[in-house]
Amino acid sequence: MNMLIAQLPETYSIFAPVIDILPVIPILFFLLAFVWQASVGFR
């Protein structure tokens, strides 16, 4: 991933932290859904 970012123009270097966070978002949604179902009681 870092090689890909290094090849991009300098204007995209601002979005590098966002690209690093992107893979974590589905995991956060899964955890949020799990906690929500646990609070509801797995109905």
Curated annotation (Swiss-Prot):
Pfam families: PsbK. InterPro entries: PSII_PsbK, PSII_PsbK_sf. Residues 1-6 form a propeptide. The chain crosses the membrane at residues 14-34. GO terms for biological process: photosynthesis. Belongs to the PsbK family. This is Photosystem II reaction center protein K. It comes from Cyanidioschyzon merolae (strain NIES-3377 / 10D) (Unicellular red alga).
